[in-house]
Amino acid sequence: MAVDKGFKKIPGSYKYKIASEPWEFEAIHNLNYKTFVEEIPQHKKCLDRKLIDKFHGENRYLICVHGEILLGMIALRDRRPLSLDLKIGNLEAYLPPFKSILEYRLLAIKEEYRNSSVFAGLMKMAFNTALRKGYDVAVISGTTRKARLYGHLGFKPFGPFVGGHGAIFQPMYIDITSAFEFKKNSRVLTG
């Protein structure tokens, strides 16, 4: 994998895609470790500094890369039970009626790219995927530090907080039709 020392942020050179290459999955495991072990203490440390998600085989990873450098990712999963089902139980009790549900998981962006277009590009791709595949509702466990940002995208909080030990998350949902309307009117997610 390429080393990104001295890389300049050039938005036109970002590529958004579904992860498919071995190096991309390796980079995903490394970014998961950095984000969800070192930064947000959700999992225990390990010597190989990799975190392979327990639903890895079922996840569809949407990624942003520059060459062979992973800048950010989000995982999509629709197989029940969702991780939020396991954390709070009966999701249907908290959500408006829906026919199909998608979970956005493991949103992670390299620290030096968090104030770039990477987040918006990943969310645009996630919304487009949900709309194209016919999902009614998407859910996410958003870190409480970024709950306001998710709110600006149209996500609504529901249910109790989940997590613990310095990693508190707010379950949130978005009606996919609303997300599409928001996307049409958003300067951030258009283009």
Predicted regions and their residues:
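Cytosolic beta-strand hydrophobic patch enriched in CBS
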Residues: 61-65
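Long, charged, glycine-rich C-terminal linkers/tails
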Residues: 45-47
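Conserved acetyl-CoA-binding loop-helix of GNAT-fold acetyltransferases
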Residues: 114-128
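Conserved acyl-donor/pantetheine-binding loop and adjacent beta-alpha core of acyl/acetyltransferases
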Residues: 70-114, 163, 191
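Terminal substrate-recognition subdomain of acyl/acetyltransferases
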Residues: 1-40, 49-58, 69-70, 74, ...
